[in-house]
Amino acid sequence: MAVDASRPFPLIRNKTLNIAALLSKKNTKSEKQELDFATVQVPGVLPRLVQIPSEEENAKCFILLEQIIEKNIDKLFLNYEVLCAYPYRIMRNADLTIDEDEAEDLLKEIQKQLKMRQWGEVIRLEVESGIDKRLLRFLKDELKVAEEDIFCIQGPIDLTFLMKMYGLPGCDHLRYKPYTPQKNPKIEPGENIFELIRKGDIFLHHPYQTFDPVVDFIRQAASDPDVLAIKQTLYRVSGNSPIIASLAQAAENGKQVSVLVELKARFDEENNIVWAKKLEQAGCHVIYGLVGLKTHSKITLVVRKEEDEIRRYVHLGTGNYNDSTAKLYTDMGMFTSKTRYGEDATAVFNMLSGYSEPLVWNKLSLAPLWLRGKFLSLIEREKEHAKNGRPARIIAKMNSLCDPGIIEALYDALSLIHISEPTRLRC
């Protein structure tokens, strides 16, 4: 695509790979060389990794699609000399600007905002190291990118193509040996999950232990004639989710099914809209989330009629109800039928689906109202133990730590207590 007075700089889609080129018309008599700019999108429908013959026996040789285009780019611009060509990629601001207080229909508003995401502000420009300065200046001006948001990449841009190589035949040496998750010693496949939970709480550690009991918990609840209701929060689920299928089946079987599908789950908004509609069509009561907040908790409540009582079964987890990522991500979960957990789980869903704000909790703490205070009191408790000569230690595992109050409290406790804190992202 050429760029000049009549052909404006095109919309470059987020994270697509493109090639920028500087051109000069051949056989011009002008003393001053006039430069033209063009951009070529690397086709996303073609394999980026192209295998070519190798001179060495049993060796595999590959070339990238953008390298093929670069070597032959002159064929796209007849009667023009290609002075230089370099690949580049942009990233756009993916935040959705939603005025939830004014939005009459959150689902429709998010759908509208998703269409506008492709026009988001460019927040990162990646270029190949050694790019021609004239070409870089042109890209910077047209894309309106700040100097600090330009990244010169040594080697190929966007390394996700390496996953394709990982899966190719003959590349076994690039792969770890497959890991088979262990069964939880308290759970035998095919057994009644509710009977097992009644015997005692069950702790799960994924991916070292299989996620199957969680999937089976929802599946059995959907078909169990004694189950009256299922309530669940969903943030991210797999592409062909057995949990979604079980929830839909439960509603079709006449059970009361309430599901909070978080429509504002970053980069899963479109998927979650699809799942929300599917669950609604099956007869589930679907909640789209709370105004001004993201519901990130992972909790399931199953209400079951047993002899002369109603018993509540609860699953709590640190990870998504996603049977695919549960094979990779380190998370913990717990099944329980203890009354106090059941009462708290009921209170959570009453908050999510209605107008309710409990003042007292038995076991659970929720952000943003109570969780920070709970952690601060636990840190203070360990400090008091240390001051009084009792054993004191803090072990905290988290994705990220960015709350100023918690950070300050941990620093304050560090002089008294040994703190182990594996943090996945940032601190």
Regions found by a protein language model. Give the residues of each.
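Short, surface-exposed connector motifs at secondary-structure boundaries
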Residues: 116-123, 224-231, 252-260, 282-283, ...
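Conserved short loop/turn motifs at secondary-structure junctions
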Residues: 124-131, 231-238, 260-268, 395-401
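N-terminal non-catalytic structural scaffold regions of very large proteins
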Residues: 1-228, 244-246, 412-416
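Phosphate/diphosphate-binding loops
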Residues: 261-329
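Flexible, glycine-rich loop/tail regions that form catalytic "lids" or insertion modules at the edges
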Residues: 6, 176-182, 187-188, 344-398, ...
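Signature of lipid phosphatidyltransferase scaffolds
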Residues: 59-80, 88-90, 301-376, 380
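Residue-level detector of conserved catalytic or cofactor/ligand-binding positions
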Residues: 415-427
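Catalytic-core regions built around general acid/base machinery
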Residues: 243-253, 275-279, 409-416
